[in-house]
Curated annotation (Swiss-Prot):
Keyword Kinase tagged: yes
Keywords noted in UniProt: ATP-binding, Folate biosynthesis, Kinase, Nucleotide-binding, Transferase
One Pfam family recorded for the sequence: HPPK
Biological function: Catalyzes the transfer of pyrophosphate from adenosine triphosphate (ATP) to 6-hydroxymethyl-7,8-dihydropterin, an enzymatic step in folate biosynthesis pathway.
Matches recorded under PANTHER family: 2-AMINO-4-HYDROXY-6-HYDROXYMETHYLDIHYDROPTERIDINE PYROPHOSPHOKINASE
Phylogenetic classification of the source organism: Bacteria, Bacillati, Bacillota, Bacilli, Lactobacillales
PROSITE patterns found in the cross-reference section: HPPK (PS00794)
Name of the featured protein: 2-amino-4-hydroxy-6-hydroxymethyldihydropteridine pyrophosphokinase
Annotated organism of origin: Streptococcus pyogenes serotype M1
InterPro entries assigned to the protein according to its UniProt record, in alphabetical order: Hppk, Hppk_sf
Pathway the protein acts in: Cofactor biosynthesis; tetrahydrofolate biosynthesis; 2-amino-4-hydroxy-6-hydroxymethyl-7,8-dihydropteridine diphosphate from 7,8-dihydroneopterin triphosphate: step 4/4
Gene3D superfamilies, per database record: 7,8-Dihydro-6-hydroxymethylpterin-pyrophosphokinase HPPK (3.30.70.560)
Listed GO biological process terms: folic acid biosynthetic process; tetrahydrofolate biosynthetic process
Amino acid sequence: MTIVYLSLGTNMGDRAAYLQKALEALADLPQTRLLAQSSIYETTAWGKTGQADFLNMACQLDTQLTAADFLKETQAIEQSLGRVRHEKWGSRTIDIDILLFGEEVYDTKELKVPHPYMTERAFVLIPLLELQPDLKLPPNHKFLRDYLAALDQSDITLFSAQQTEF
């Protein structure tokens, strides 16, 4: 089994409902268990301004799927929830990013793990570190909290600390 950390984000429609539906779909993946989910945070758009605010969260899973198969499954969930990939950093019903896939490192056209922008995004690190405060970034094993300490966190607010049982 491999421990996987994901970041989920949405800024269209009923944002909280999209997060919930994505979590339910992730919990139903074959050979996969949803172990934990973070609180939900509201943040301004990153990368492309002038959009609606995002809701962001993280979750931890345990899977027997390969990273490539896991990516296909998350992309299928995005598509089933109406995700249309027409603009980089544009609005989306749901975005599911693989942040960490065990200690594995991937650098292919389809998959880059650890996620290449995670250390630059407080809206990713805050919920991720809520799940695992001592998490380290492979392969250098630097604490992720050290990256977070260097980032502006002023535009991130707690939206919901509510936890759902699976």
